[in-house]
Amino acid sequence: DIIIVDEASFVSTDSIEKIIEVYKSSAFMFVGDPGQIESIEFGNWFDLLLNLLKAKDVVFTLDVEYRTKVVELTKIWDEVRHGKKKNIIELLSAYEMTEEISDDIFKVQENEVVLCLNYDGLYGINNINRYLQASNPNDAFEYQQNLYKVGDPVVFITNDYSAYGIYNNLSGKIVGIKNEEENITFKIELLESVSYFGKLSNEIEIVEEGSGFYAIVTKMKYYNDKYDTDMDTRTKLPFQISYAMSIHKAQGLEFDSVKIVITKESDEQVTKNIFYTAVTRAKKNLKVYWQPEVADYVLGNIENSEESKTADLSILSEQLKKYI
């Protein structure tokens, strides 16, 4: 048997140890991008493994870029991978992909996302979502104290229907809202194809219309049973508005245009992996919004972390040579 572990960089050391223990008689294929965000729990085993085994003819790099044909973007990505502060800032400046924080952040475009580190504050996810939704001229419908409009971008936040193609982080756009006395129904255009059509539950149905795929989500507005302990689940929508989102949430997604906002309040959170994940979400346009001192701090940390990692790998390699 061959066990394939996808998004390997996101798997914790504890989890991969358990997987190997369960399937210890199997062969393993680990697939992922070591430059992207590491596991929330402890462990950067995937990155270490690649460096330790790269001379053993078991590491293969897929070097054909499918996300973008924009040469400037691929050059930026390469420089971030290498972690050289001077080269990164020079390219960002030369390609006009860096700018001081301004109101330009609040000018919305089609298939664009604003990536942030924090939820609160003027340039946090919550406020940017409110502001950009307010610029949507369509009528607003309130449900569970939140507003929704036709044209709002959304991202699904459930894995309950992953077997049918509706998975956590699936992107879509609201194209219809039917507001009735007892129910509210959302028609969401899915930005990825699905393999199943029909009712997934009493609340979600997948339909195909022309060349498009749509999720029809219906929720009851009210539950009269005060003893219904499952009421929150029954009324909670499986998606949320996504004009802006966290960089962690954006992992695995791609957009025509990406704006990254890094403020003084959040600069300490930006690791090399987080910054790399953010800039590689863009297919066509990229802009990083930060003050000069923030850019200097963030890119300095990225360069220092790369030097520290190189030293750690050298020590670890010497210790493990006798086992490999």
Stretch-by-stretch model annotation:
Residues 21-24, 53-54, 280-282:
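Short, conserved loop/helix-junction motifs that constitute active-site signature segments
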Residues 35-180, 184-187, 192-198, 218, ...:
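Conserved helicase motor core of P-loop NTPases
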Residues 1-2, 25-29, 285-287:
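Loop/turn-to-beta-strand initiation segments
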Residues 6-7, 32:
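Walker B catalytic acidic pair
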Residues 138-276:
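Conserved nucleotide-binding/hydrolysis modules and their immediate coupling elements
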Residues 13-26, 48:
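Short, conserved "post-DEAD/DEAH" coupling segment immediately C-terminal to helicase motif II
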Residues 48-49, 257-324:
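Helicase C-terminal subdomain and adjacent C-terminal extension
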Residues 10-12, 37-38:
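Catalytic P-loop NTPase motifs of RecA-like helicase/translocase cores
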